[in-house]
Amino acid sequence: QNTLGPICANYIKAVYGSECFTCGKRCEGRDRQAGHFIPRTYSPVKYNEDNVRVQCSRCNEFYAGKPVEYERKLRLQIGDEAVENLKRESTKAWKWERQWLIDKILYYRQALKEREEAA
């Protein structure tokens, strides 16, 4: 998990750029974070791409992710059904299996490599 978190965050930042999902502010460097709709603590949707978007540190840390605004915008972007699915999946019992974590790390590494090669 220690390796997967940063790789997943880098992927989200590469895909969604530098605009904060919740407030629209341009964010760079340490101000640019991977913010989670469903909090990542003990959550099986922690590494689900639908659950993570770029957020500025102000929205993500000081306003606890702005959950109401996040959900409203996420519903517009991925649809009500996908948001409800995230909520359902987040309540399930989950144990991180080693092979699943390795597969996710490889997936994000390959996706980042392909994005870099395409740029």
PLM regions and their residue ranges:
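Phosphate-binding glycine-rich loops and adjacent basic patches that engage nucleotide phosphates
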Residues: 16-19, 30-40, 64-73
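Histidine-centered nuclease catalytic patch
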Residues: 21-54
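Conserved aromatic-histidine-acidic binding/catalytic patches
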Residues: 4, 8, 44, 62
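Short, charged surface segments at domain edges that flank catalytic/cofactor-binding sites
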Residues: 1-19, 94-98
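A detector for short metal-coordination/catalytic motifs
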Residues: 64-119
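Short Cys/His-centered divalent metal-binding micro-motifs
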Residues: 24-28, 52-79
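General structural signal for alpha-helix termini and helix-helix connectors
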Residues: 40-43, 58-61, 92
